[in-house]
């Protein structure tokens, strides 16, 4: 777990009325080394909102998991499955970490990436389609109010996740440069790559060797097992191969050396 960290921030309810439907909280906001300000947020409400952005795909993934593990759908907790939206966000954060490894102070914070990605997501069923849709659409959800750039908290209008951009405009500039680089690395360059080896090399430049090697090795193993078990599908002429059936997909027949 040395690659992960957890931020812990003390907070209290926003009001003294402890009602179960009131989930707003009051927290401290660091202005500088010795000054703090009151701010408000609603992480529980945010989580519920995030789940609504992928509710149909989340339900589908839970049904698949339940069937494969012989469980009732109600018994499948959300954390046991991952949607294309969640995986796309993971990839964007990894790309962010590599891109800003020598400029960490200007890296976009995770809540900005997560919020814009969730707003731009349109229910795509594959990770690649999701990340293309997100990268091509997330900028339109950045508002400019009286000259101030705003990434609004969807469950608390007064909270601007990009408030530091006003104080540190170089962070805003860095964000837009990163978006353009991510579009190149995830969309333009892969489309021009010839062969899996070339594709893997392209991804290693922006995501690192280890995760790309793991992903491509697992992909090869999954494709082999899926074809052997009759669960490999082809989508159209250019849609590629996948291990889950979807609309328009054709089952790939098993391969033998004797033509049967």
Predicted regions and their residues:
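Long, charge-rich alpha-helical interaction segments
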Residues: 35-86, 204
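Arginine residue identity/basic-tract feature
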Residues: 26, 39, 47, 53, ...
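Short, Lys/Arg-enriched charge-dense amphipathic segments
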Residues: 4-21, 122-135, 170-181, 214-226, ...
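Terminal (often C-terminal) interaction modules
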Residues: 143-260
């Amino acid at each position: 777990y040395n690659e992960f960290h957890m931020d812990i921030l003390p907070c209290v309810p926003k009001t003294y009325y402890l009602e179960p439907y009131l989930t707003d909280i009051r927290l401290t906001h660091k202005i500088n080394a010795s000054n703090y300000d009151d701010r408000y947020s609603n992480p529980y409400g945010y989580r519920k909102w995030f789940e609504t952005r992928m509710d149909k795909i989340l339900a589908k993934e839970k049904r698949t998991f339940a069937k494969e593990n012989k469980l009732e759908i109600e018994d499948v907790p959300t954390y046991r499955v991952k949607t294309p939206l969640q995986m796309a966000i993971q990839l964007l954060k990894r790309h962010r970490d590599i891109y800003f490894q020598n400029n960490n102070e200007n890296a976009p914070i995770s809540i900005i990436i997560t919020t814009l990605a969730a707003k731009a997501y349109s229910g795509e069923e594959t990770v690649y389609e999701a990340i293309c849709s997100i990268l091509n659409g997330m900028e339109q959800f950045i508002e400019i109010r009286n000259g101030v750039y705003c990434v609004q908290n969807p469950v608390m209008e007064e909270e601007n996740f990009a408030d530091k951009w006003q104080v540190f405009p170089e962070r805003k500039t860095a964000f837009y440069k990163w978006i353009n680089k991510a579009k190149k690395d995830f969309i333009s360059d892969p489309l021009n790559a010839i062969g899996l080896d070339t594709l893997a090399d392209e991804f290693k430049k922006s995501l690192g060797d280890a995760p790309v090697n793991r992903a491509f090795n697992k992909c090869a193993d999954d494709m082999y097992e899926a074809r052997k078990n009759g669960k490999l599908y082809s989508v159209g002429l250019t849609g590629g191969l996948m291990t889950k059936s979807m609309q328009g997909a054709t089952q790939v027949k098993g391969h033998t050396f004797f033509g049967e």
